[in-house]
Swiss-Prot record:
Pfam families: LRR_6 (PF13516). It comes from Mus musculus (Mouse). Keywords: Leucine-rich repeat, Phosphoprotein, Repeat. LRR repeats lie at residues 149-170, 174-195, 202-222, 234-255, 259-280. Residues 376-406 are annotated as: Disordered. The modification Phosphoserine is found at S399. This is Leucine-rich repeat-containing protein 42. Residues 396-406 have a biased composition (Low complexity). It comes from the Eukaryota. Belongs to the LRRC42 family.
Length: 421
């Protein structure tokens, strides 16, 4: 401003005219230096030579800078010129809502096509990985769209994701396939209790391989089905392999799964395997398979739905958080220096393929197909004999002592467990 005021004194005002007695006179002619004033006036300059102007944008925040250019799409022509065009109003509104997706009140009744685009936009901005806000946003989608958000969830060997994103995992509804193999759940884990809720009554395939489960965990998981006929009543496939704490008594709790078609109890702590085979066949019609079943090769269970990439983002964030917290190199060097046994920190791998167990050692069961109604008379007679054998075994089991034990078991254990929910 000071420069501008000083520059005003050097500016040439040009010729000045005055009207007097009806005649127009030029004042400059009456002054000294008339010849100089009659010369061509110098061009008017607001700024001197060498003065440059810089257009300053808002540099306080990168987000603000992005918002100013977010309304345009920049492309290049064939000649190499930069060309920009304005985005559609739908894209602008979609981007704004996805940035504030955690503030949505409800999405119930909202069109699925638009909701999927909104979900993808929020996922691209990694809104579901934010603590707190991501959970609130995910709950709005799962409440409104259920299985469209996720119908199959595979968390095999992703115990870090289970530990860090437990509430997010519990928000999923109407899952049909759930793989929790090698997640170290144990009998008292919240997720094991969550399996009995109505939100997961649609689960038909459940993999709980190598989860440190025992008979108590199986009893807790099957209590709602056995007593109130709700929970995992639609379960058709169950994998309980590599849980050595499950004994013959725990297998008895599985008889409440009347729709069970495939069962894997390999690597459990069974004592009388022959008796378990007979009980499974007599109670729920499952037959021991002599060859490994393809249903348990863990190839069909995959994460499917809108949120399939979100699970990968959770895993990436969890691994990075653990790496930042761990600084084990100095400690390892000290352990080697003092000749102590260094603790090996390796990622625990899920024993999907047991090299020590051949096909004959696997305890996998399946349900036989229903026979044709026009079967031979001989097979019908053999069936009748089997039924008589089953009735005799049931009569032996229905002794007063066993009936009393069943009644006491239901009254003391099951009802106490159900009252804790």
């Amino acid at each position: 401003m000071a420069y501008y005021l000083n520059s005003e004194a050097h500016l040439d005002p040009g010729p000045i005219y005055v009207r007097e007695n009806g005649q127009l006179h030029m004042v400059n002619l009456a002054l000294d230096g008339v010849k100089n004033s009659l010369q061509k006036p110098r061009p008017f300059r607001l700024f001197p030579k060498g003065f440059s102007v810089e257009l300053c944008m808002n540099r306080e925040d990168d987000t603000a800078q992005k918002e100013k250019t977010d309304h345009f799409i920049f492309t290049y022509t064939r000649e190499g010129n930069l060309r920009y065009s304005a985005k559609s109003l739908f894209s602008l509104v979609l981007g704004f809502i996805s940035d504030n997706v955690d503030h949505i009140d409800s999405l119930i009744g909202f069109p699925e096509q638009i909701a999927e685009k909104l979900f993808s936009a929020a996922e691209a901005r990694q809104k579901f990985t934010e603590p707190g806000a991501g959970l609130r946003a995910l709950q709005k989608f799962t409440e409104a769209y259920g299985s469209l958000v996720l119908c199959s969830l595979c968390l095999r060997n992703r115990y870090l994701v289970v530990a860090e994103k437990l509430e997010e995992i519990k928000s999923f509804r109407e899952l049909t396939r759930l793989d929790l193999s090698c997640c170290w759940l144990g009998d008292e884990h919240e997720l094991l209790e969550h399996l009995t809720n109505e939100a997961l009554s649609s689960v038909t395939q459940l993999h709980l391989k190598d989860n440190c489960l025992s008979d108590a965990g199986i009893r807790k998981m099957t209590a709602p089905v056995r007593v109130m006929k709700r929970g995992l009543e639609n379960l058709a496939l169950l994998d309980l392999s590599c849980n050595p704490e499950i004994t013959d008594a725990g297998i008895g709790y599985l008889f409440s799964f009347r729709k069970l078609n495939c069962l894997d109890i390999s690597g459990t702590g069974l004592k009388d395997i022959k008796a378990v085979k007979d009980k499974l066949r007599a109670n729920i019609g499952l037959v021991h398979s002599k060859v490994p079943l393809k249903e348990f090769d863990h190839s069909n269970c995959k994460t499917e739905g809108w949120a399939d990439q979100i699970v990968l983002q959770w895993e990436r964030v969890s691994v990075e958080a653990v790496r930042q917290r761990k600084d084990v190199e100095p400690r390892k060097a000290a352990q080697y220096f003092y000749q102590n046994r260094a603790r090996t920190e390796v990622t625990r791998k899920c024993p999907l393929a047991e090299t020590h167990m051949n096909s004959s050692g696997k305890l996998q069961f399946y349900r036989e197909e229903a026979p044709d109604c026009h079967e031979p008379l001989l097979s019908q007679e053999s069936k009748k004999s089997k039924k008589r054998a089953f009735k005799e075994s049931e009569q032996e089991q229905s002794s007063p002592q066993s009936a009393k034990q069943k009644c006491v078991c239901l009254a003391v254990e099951d009802w106490d467990l159900l009252n804790s929910y």
